[in-house]
């Protein structure tokens, strides 16, 4: 059976692993998942990630905790296969008054909402993180 929304699956795996206190989570890999993991690492929401290539490519994300609680409080999918969400450079959302981030897929790559505003590009809003 094929997976309908691999990004939603990735976000759900991260949420579930953090709820039970796991140190890392493994999932099937793709270019978009690696890009999202890279943004999460750069912004400090996860400790790091490791991608293996080959016939069965896997992505392992090392989760991050602060005083025993997950660093990621909310991880929500915005654009989904049934209802894509696009925003221009002036319409990009701010998450929790700028405390969180929105991950955006643009023509210049996957980046945060702040980086997209600075680059002057809009795109598909993949998810929000707080």
From Swiss-Prot:
Alphabetical UniProt keywords: Ribonucleoprotein, Ribosomal protein, RNA-binding, rRNA-binding
InterPro entries assigned: Ribosomal_uS8, Ribosomal_uS8_CS, Ribosomal_uS8_sf
GO molecular function (one): rRNA binding
Entry GO CC: ribonucleoprotein complex; ribosome
A family per Pfam: Ribosomal_S8
GO biological process, alphabetically ordered: translation
Record note on quaternary structure: Part of the 30S ribosomal subunit. Contacts proteins S5 and S12.
Cross-referenced PANTHER family: 40S RIBOSOMAL PROTEIN S15A
Function, as annotated: One of the primary rRNA binding proteins, it binds directly to 16S rRNA central domain where it helps coordinate assembly of the platform of the 30S subunit.
Family as reported in the entry's similarity comment: Belongs to the universal ribosomal protein uS8 family.
Protein name, as recorded: Small ribosomal subunit protein uS8
